[in-house]
């Protein structure tokens, strides 16, 4: 069973507008990246010391998120048939200047998966509840038009893995509460539409 397109588009349009009105993408600029940078430094400094000799300190390192874009949202029934998943795809770039390496720019594509579920009160009335919210990295790729140096090649895998862990754990902690607030303030008619969709799916199954 698929979510009717006319219902899905109403809900995704409202969510998209709410994200844009709430400056959702600007939240990325407020996320503390110091921990991420320190983790990357800790993991690659030893290898770089071996490859190129003693390095300067972390004052020569910099990281920032930039060029964030919100892509087309979508809805689908959860695999367990007990709710609806909202998929929110994001694209962004990560600029990284690391010690003596040339500056790197990594392209990131990640999906936010937020689950909506039903809860009932003592009177048997249903309300929409915000369930699990996770970030799933889909792609982390170095943007470059030039051949990679031996040094960059040696540390790139470590950087990509560390960035992936950060997206899954820290970035989700920064963005998911805002999604929760947005869902809590959805138009009542849209909330009722979502509740009815979940109930109808449960009855079919």
UniProtKB/Swiss-Prot annotation:
Keywords: Disulfide bond, Secreted. The keyword Disulfide bond applies. The keyword Disulfide bond applies. It is found in: Secreted. One of its GO terms (molecular function) is lipid binding. GO terms for biological process: surfactant homeostasis. InterPro entries: Bactericidal_perm-incr_a/b_dom (IPR017943), BPI_fold-superfamily_member (IPR051902), Lipid-bd_serum_glycop_N (IPR017942). Pfam families: LBP_BPI_CETP. Disulfide bonds join 133-176. GO terms for cellular component: extracellular region. It comes from the Eukaryota. Major protein in sweat, has surfactant properties. Belongs to the BPI/LBP/Plunc superfamily. Plunc family. Monomer. This is Latherin. It comes from Equus quagga burchellii (Burchell's zebra). The lineage of its organism: Eukaryota, Metazoa, Chordata, Craniata, Vertebrata.
């Amino acid at each position: 069973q698929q979510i009717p397109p006319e219902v899905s588009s109403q809900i995704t349009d409202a969510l998209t507008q709410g994200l844009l009105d709430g400056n959702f993408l600007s939240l990325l600029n407020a996320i503390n990246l110091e921990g991420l940078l320190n983790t990357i430094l800790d993991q690659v400094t030893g290898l770089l010391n071996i490859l190129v000799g003693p390095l300067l300190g972390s004052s020569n390192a910099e990281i920032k998120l930039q060029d964030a874009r919100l892509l087309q949202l979508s809805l689908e029934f959860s695999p367990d048939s007990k709710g609806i998943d909202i998929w929110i795809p994001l694209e962004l770039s990560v600029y990284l200047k690391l010690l003596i390496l040339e500056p790197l720019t990594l392209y990131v594509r990640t999906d936010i998966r937020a689950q909506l579920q039903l809860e009932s009160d003592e009177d048997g009335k249903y309300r929409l509840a915000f369930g699990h919210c996770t970030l799933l990295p889909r792609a982390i790729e170095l943007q470059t038009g030039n051949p990679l140096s031996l040094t960059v090649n040696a540390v790139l895998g470590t950087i990509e893995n560390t960035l992936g862990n950060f997206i899954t754990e820290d970035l989700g902690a920064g963005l998911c509460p805002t999604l929760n607030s947005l869902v809590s303030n959805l138009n009542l008619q849209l909330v009722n539409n979502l509740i009815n969709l979940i109930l109808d799916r449960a009855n079919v199954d």
